[in-house]
Each structure stands twice: as C-alpha cells, then as structure tokens.
C-alpha cells in the first residue's frame, strides 16, 4: 500500500548521508547525479519562463508546496521573492536546513496546508501532486487555491504520462479541468522534458531486453533499479545516455516552442486565481 509520507520519509533517510546535492531523493533516486542535474536544469529553465509569464513584483510571497530539500525556495529567494516552503517529510526539511535554506520552512500536507486563506501571491507545485493518489489530488489543488490571494498565480509542473507505483499522472486537459474547478483560470501551458532522443534510446533498450525474454534484465534500465548482477549492463546503459542526454537538453527549447505540451513528459501550467 503506497503512502506518500512514508515513501518520501524512506527516501530522505536513505540519501541523507550520501547525497550532498539534495537532488537524488526528489528526482530519480537510482539515476546518476549528472542525470538529475540535467533534469534540474531544464526544470529550472521552465520554471523561470513561468515566473516571467506571471510578472511578479519584487518581494512577492511564494509558497512552495512539497519543498523537499529546498531547491526551489532557495532559487525563489535568489530571484528576489519571499518564499516559504512546506513539506510533509521532516527528513526532507532537515536536509533543506542543512543546505542553508534561509527561508521559513513548515511541516504540512499538500491537502491540509497549515496556512490561512489568501496568504500568498504565488503557489508553486513542482512534481508534487503527481505523487499523491488520485482520490486526494483534488483536495491538494483545493488547498493550494485556498491559500492563494485573489489575482495570485499558481504554477504547477506535473507529469502527464507514465503512471507507476508512486506516480499518478493526468492528461494536460485533466490537470486544467481539475484546477479550474477550484476558482483559477489557465493563462499559459507548455511542455517540459520532451527528451525525444533520450526517450527513444531508453524505450528501445528496454524493448530489446524484454524481447530477449528477460523481464528482470529489462528492469535494470529503469531509474529505480539497483540490481548488482546487472551492474555492468547498467553502467554501459548510463554511459550511452550520458552522450544522448546533453543533446536532449540542447533541443528542449526548440521542442517547447514548436510542439504541444501533450508531446512532453511533464507540463507546466500557469493559473491565475479569480478576483
């Protein structure tokens, strides 16, 4: 039985002492650091675009829901805003503080936020609600709109394909419809993490191993694999991806501008709360 709080607590305990970057427990835990840094880079690029679209005033009060190890609240502060982070996992908040996150941090659930109504100019949710079971996702979106000021901005970066044990994506139109049911209006939406060359290579590699009739070996290609007996295969696999991923990162802005959000892995949604 999947429990978001227990799942993330387990990751924070597992990587607290071995990951100085703070990226592994919040992105792809079993992937190499360079891969997580590439994902972090394109996510930050997409988030900057969303922030520019919203045109916030300096000092705007941001709430980062599911702040994890604090990477976004630190960046919001660098951009001149006044961020607050909230996360359900005390271990994540402890890691955030160890990274000199000089912002208020609070413990709380996305679907039961410990803040008053209309408290923030912006709510950001970066790959958080996608990890909440479907039946609780509407409550999380309701809570985020509740603490957002009228006229304020809500930025969501969520998965739109690839469901899994702890991943509950929606199609772009479903994310939009669900959020708008709580009193916000979409002002922009664009894709994030197209990564076509890398997705093609990863998909073909997994298909190859499945066709050889070894499901276990096929699983070694996933981000979450730690199979020791296939360590050589896994190293070769990631060495190939290290060649392909930089090209995917380079092409990302091109794909963002010419392809629909539905062709990407994630989408960014920028909403404004009705006055």
Task: Label the model's feature ranges.
Residues 1-55, 59-66:
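Conserved class I S-adenosyl-L-methionine
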Residues 69-112:
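Class I SAM-dependent methyltransferase SAM/SAH-binding core
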Residues 124:
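A conserved beta-strand element that flanks and buttresses the S-adenosyl-L-methionine
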Residues 138-150:
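A short glycine-rich, Lys/Arg-flanked "PGG" loop and its adjoining helix->strand segment in the class I
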Residues 151-158:
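Conserved beta-strand signature within the Rossmann-like core of class I S-adenosyl-L-methionine
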Residues 168-183:
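Short alpha-helix
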Residues 196-275:
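A C-terminal cap/extension of S-adenosyl-L-methionine-dependent methyltransferases
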């Amino acid at each position: 039985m999947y429990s978001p709080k227990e799942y993330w607590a387990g990751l924070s305990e597992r990587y607290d002492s071995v990951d100085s970057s703070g990226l592994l427990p919040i992105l792809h835990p079993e992937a190499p650091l360079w891969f997580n840094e590439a994902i972090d880079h394109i996510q930050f690029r997409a988030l900057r675009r969303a922030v520019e679209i919203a045109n916030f005033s300096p000092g705007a009060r941001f709430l980062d829901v599911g702040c994890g190890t604090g990477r976004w609240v630190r960046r919001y502060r660098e951009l001149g805003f006044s961020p607050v982070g909230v996360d359900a996992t005390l271990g994540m908040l402890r890691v955030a503080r160890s990274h000199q996150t000089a912002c208020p941090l609070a413990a709380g659930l996305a679907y039961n936020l410990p803040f008053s109504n209309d408290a923030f100019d912006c709510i950001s949710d970066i790959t958080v609600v996608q990890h909440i079971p479907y039946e609780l996702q509407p409550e999380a979106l309701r809570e985020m709109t509740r603490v957002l000021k009228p006229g304020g901005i809500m930025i969501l970066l969520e998965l739109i394909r690839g469901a899994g044990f702890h991943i509950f994506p929606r199609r772009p139109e479903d994310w939009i419809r669900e959020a708008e049911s709580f009193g916000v209006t979409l002002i922009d939406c664009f894709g994030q993490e197209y990564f076509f060359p890398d997705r093609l290579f990863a998909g073909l590699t997994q298909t190859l191993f499945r066709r050889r009739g070894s499901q276990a070996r096929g699983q070694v290609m996933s981000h979450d694999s730690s199979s020791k007996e296939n360590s050589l295969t896994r190293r070769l696999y990631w060495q190939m991806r290290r060649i392909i991923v930089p090209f995917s990162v380079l092409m990302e802005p091109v794909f963002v501008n010419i392809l629909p959000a539905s062709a990407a892995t994630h989408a960014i949604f920028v909403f404004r709360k009705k006055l």
